[in-house]
Amino acid sequence: MTTVGDDAPDFTASLVDGDIEPFRLDDRLGDEPVVLAFFPAAFSNTCTDEMEALRDEFDRGDCTLFGVSTDLPHALAAYRTQYELPFGLVGDPDHRAIEAYDVIEDFEHYGVETVAQRAVFVIDGDGVVTYRWLAEHSGQEPDYDALDEAVDEAADEAAA
C-alpha cells in the first residue's frame, strides 16, 4: 500500500487532455506537486460530484491535477468535454496505476470487476507521497480543505 513518505510508484497509461497521448507519471514530476485523484467510473454520480468539486474548488496554479480511472480514454474524453474539466484525465484500463497504488475496488454488483478505489495522493516535486486519502466507501468524497492544505504544504516546500 502506497503511503505518505513512500516514493510515488511510476506507471504508464493514456492521458486525455485535449488529445489522447501517452502518460508516464515520472515525466510529470518536477517543480510543483502532482495530485492524483483516483475515481471509480466516469459519468457516475459521486465521481462526477468529485470531479466537478475539483474543477470548481481546486483552481490553483501551483500544482498539476490528474483524475485517474479505469475507463477507456475515449470515454474519458467525452466525460471531460461534457463536464468541462480543465485538468487531464488518465485512463488506466490495464490497471497499472490502481495496482501500483493498491487502490483496487470491485463493483461486481454493477457488473464491473475492477475499478479504482476513490483515493487522492499528493506527490511532491521529488516524487515522494506527501498526502494520502482513501475512501471508506465509494460514495465518500475527499476532504477538499485537507487536500488544499496538503497541496499548500507541498507547494511551499517546492518554492523554498
Predicted regions and their residues:
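Chalcogenol-based redox active-site neighborhoods
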Residues: 1-160
